Amino acid sequence: MKLANIKSAKAFAPATSANFAVGYDLLGFAINGVGDTVELIKRDDTELVIKQISGAAGADKLLFDTDRNVATAVIKKFLADKNIRLGFDVYIQKGITLGSGMGGSAASSVAALVAMNAFFETPYSYNDLIDYAIYGESLISGSFHGDNAVPCMFGGLVLLQSSKPCKKIDLPIVDCNVVIVCPNLSIETKKARELLKEPYDLSTIVEHSACLAATISALYTQDIELLSESLKDILIEPRRFKLIIGFYDVQKAAYDAGAIACGISGSGPTMFALVKKQDDANVVAKAMQDKFKEFNLKSNSWISAMSGKGAYILEKK
């Protein structure tokens, strides 16, 4: 593989919201305005060295061990599999809070791979990189699923037909805004997944499957009313809500303020809400944040289109 004539590359990868209420490990969308940045500076040897990790809350807890930090672990695996000898100094800027349910591990994995890819004269396609990003996410979650990594890399709203190997379906986007509210809590993905170990009744699975099918239909037919009726999480939310202080109160506040849907983003504690109008988005965001305040929780909010942009190169030189 011939190398490009550059010494450094910096890439950005967006935050994501996984599950979308009805698609556990299957659905996810990219979020505008927040994400992780990884800069790679080429070394004269083949070592990977993490020089700096900075940024959002929890960044100081991330590991400098290159086998256990997802950003370097995915680069190391890719280079080993392709038998490519390269070394980098690595600088990680976290825009996504640790344990927030906004795809932080996926974003670091994706940003690292996209930055690495810039060093090749003929870059690999994102399809060549995505399995490595999902691998990176699995190091944190303990499960090989791509509902964060795939929308993070490609953007938009995606349905995962398969995570291993990755097979995705790009879904139509409805004309709605997404409100993202992240309270000052942290939830480990592995612990959140442990709450789902007990079997579900078949009737619950059937009802949830109907919600998923109706949601997909609503997206293709652009039926906002059907989408609002269908985005009901009867599978995951009843077991995970207890991890998010004031969850049902915040959810009710979102609906009362005009949201057409509201649920948990990924493993939480971040919550998402869908709104029809831009003006409603600000009202819903404020209502959700005000309700979290009643539980003595500070929070951050973002407003995004569902057609969020995927990962991209910020600079190379």
Model-derived regions, located:
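Short, small-residue alpha-helix embedded
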Residues: A106-F120, S265, T270-L274
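ATP-binding N-lobe of GHMP and related small-molecule kinases
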Residues: M1-S100, V114, A118-Y124, F154-G155, ...
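Short, well-ordered amphipathic alpha-helical segments that serve as non-catalytic structural scaffolds
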Residues: N69-L79, L212, V250, A287-M288
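Acyltransferase
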Residues: D175-K252, D256
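Short, conserved charged micro-motifs
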Residues: T46-V49, T189, D279-A285
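Glycine-rich, charge-dense phosphate/pyrophosphate-binding loop(s)
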Residues: L219-K317
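Short beta-strand-to-turn element immediately C-terminal to the catalytic PLP-Schiff-base lysine
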Residues: I41, P151-S163, A273-K276, L314-K316
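Alpha/beta catalytic cores of group-transfer enzymes, especially the acyltransferase/condensing modules
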Residues: Y126-I173, C262-I264
